[in-house]
C-alpha cells in the first residue's frame, strides 16, 4: 500500500498526525463542525494528505484505532492479533481498557460505528481464506462489538478479567 510521493512509514505517520488532530478537536466540538482545514492546521499536515488517504473523518478515527491495536499487539507480542480466540480474549479487553478515554470520547460523539469498522478491518481474513473463516470472523466481530459496546455504555464497570469470564461463559 505504498503511496506515490512518499514511503509508507511517512504516510502512516502523517495519517496518524491527522487522526490525532481530529481527536483533539472532537474534545471541543462534534465531528460535523470540524473542518478539514482545521484538522490540517492543527496537525501541521497538508490538506492534500487527507484527501489522498481518507474519504471521511470517520475513516481517520478507524485508522487510528487500527494503528493503536497493531502497536499494542506488537508491544504485547500477541501472536493472534488478526483473529479472535478465547486465548486472546483478555488481551482484547485489556487493550480496549487501555484506550478507555478515546472510546468514551467516540461514544460521547455518537461515532461508535468507527469502532466496529476497526474490528472489521483487524479481524476480517485476507482474500483466499475459506468461507467458514469468513463467517467465523464476522460472527466474532459482531459479537465482540456487542460486548464492547455494552461495556463502554456501562462505564467500563467490569474489569477486563471479568469481561473475559463473560466471554468464556457465553461462548
Each model region followed by its residue ranges:
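N-terminal intrinsically disordered/low-complexity leader segments
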Residues: 1-11
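An amphipathic alpha-helix adjacent to DNA-recognition modules
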Residues: 12-23, 27, 32-33, 38-44, ...
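Amphipathic alpha-helical packing segments from all-alpha helical-bundle domains
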Residues: 107-145, 161, 169
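C-terminal peripheral helix-coil segments that are non-catalytic and often amphipathic
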Residues: 150-171
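Residue-level recognition of alpha-helical structural elements
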Residues: 7, 82-85, 108, 133-136, ...
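Helical hydrophobic small-molecule/effector-binding pocket
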Residues: 77-120
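Phosphate-coordinating loops and pocket residues in cytosolic domains that bind phosphorylated ligands
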Residues: 62, 108, 153
Amino acid at each position: 500500500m505504498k503511496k506515490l510521493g512518499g514511503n509508507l512509514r511517512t504516510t502512516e505517520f502523517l495519517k496518524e498526525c491527522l487522526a490525532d488532530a481530529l481527536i483533539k478537536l472532537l474534545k471541543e466540538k462534534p465531528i460535523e463542525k470540524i473542518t478539514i482545514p482545521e484538522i490540517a492546521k492543527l496537525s501541521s499536515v497538508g490538506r492534500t494528505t487527507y484527501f489522498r488517504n481518507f474519504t471521511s473523518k470517520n475513516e481517520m478515527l478507524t485508522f487510528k484505532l487500527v494503528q493503536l491495536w497493531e502497536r499494542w499487539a506488537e508491544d504485547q507480542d500477541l501472536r493472534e492479533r488478526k483473529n479472535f480466540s478465547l486465548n486472546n480474549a483478555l488481551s482484547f479487553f485489556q487493550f480496549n481498557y487501555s484506550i478507555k478515554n478515546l472510546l468514551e470520547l467516540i461514544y460521547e460523539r455518537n461515532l461508535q460505528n468507527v469502532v466496529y469498522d476497526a474490528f472489521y478491518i483487524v479481524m476480517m481474513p485476507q482474500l483466499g481464506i475459506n468461507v467458514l473463516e469468513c463467517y467465523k470472523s464476522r460472527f466474532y466481530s459482531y459479537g465482540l462489538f456487542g460486548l464492547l459496546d455494552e461495556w463502554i455504555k456501562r462505564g467500563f464497570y467490569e474489569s477486563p478479567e471479568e469481561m473475559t469470564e463473560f466471554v468464556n461463559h457465553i461462548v
